[in-house]
Amino acid sequence: MCAQYLQTDQGPATDASKSDGAPMLTIDQIRTACDRSEPIVLADPMFARVDLPFKETFYPLGFPLEIETNSEDILIAMAESWHGFMKLFDTPPFRLSVCVQDSRSSDCPPMPSSRVQQHIASSVADSENFSITDIAQGCSSILLTRAAVAHQDYCRYFFLESAVLSMICTSYTTPIQAACVDLEGCGVLLCGDSGAGKSTLAYACAQAGWTYITDGASFVVNSRHDRLVVGNSNQACFRPAAQEFFQELSDKLVTKRVDVGKSSIELKTSSLRNIATSYISRVNHVVFLNRREVKRQELVRFPTEVARYFMLQRLYGLPDTLTVQSSMIDRVLGAGALELRYSSLDWAIERLGRLAVEGE
């Protein structure tokens, strides 16, 4: 009798991540093993038969996600990214598979390069660390080394969170590069380029009694009329310059974000007792920030066309989804956009408060 199962060249594969070590067998080797009724040692260079025994369901931004992996460290990392989120939206679950394999290097892999062609999104750091996402089917497959997983921030930011968010923002939401804060049920998007001060102003507003939603990535839920935004209020990320505004940041460690990124200070909002947080808000106003060479502090109209293209430029996906997202941006900008020119945080908070309460 000819037995057949997945194993390495050293024996049965108790860890599926080691299964690529067995070489392809010759016909003579297979014939000999069958004649002797010995197990056939099959190679799996494509990782097509890897066992992914660890399974769990998470709710990133409130959307259901089913994950399977051969590493408990992946589940720990996912829990770190999405703790606190419960099911908010009744949608078919996204699917994520993560295979972790051994590697010779213990170094953190390089920053991945990301590309999208039609319904396939890829993110490739090197030949051993990459992800492939089918945005049409809502499924993603990730292959990582143990070295990559050991650098948890890198693994979470560039692969686990990136794959999940790419599915969410090409199906059920419209992503906008904006912080979001809420005062008495009035949500305000704080827009701007990187370094515009979105995180700083959002955090300052939260200290002044606003509800903190997110510091830089807002997701408008598609096909709704109430301009509902969902964000990750579990964390805030600042540039080192923010230490001059907030005393509590003065003793925080400045690190290279996710091992290869920009210098930053990362803060978990759960450690702050004086900050109110929420995952959702209904947006009433869109405000672009301008704190460069301000001669007069004021809130003025901002060109709607400029605001629209600023939001459109980050979108990718299938044509039908892009059509929906374009209409959602038009809905968010239904009342136009504003520009907040300021040099004082206190003045900016007071002026935004007036906008939220009085509508002007």
Where are these regions (language model features)?
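Conserved lysine of the Walker
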Residues: K198
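Post-Walker A alpha-helix
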Residues: L201-A202
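A noncatalytic interaction/capping subdomain that flanks phosphate/NTP-handling catalytic cores
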Residues: C2-L6, G21-S194, Q207-T211, S218-E360
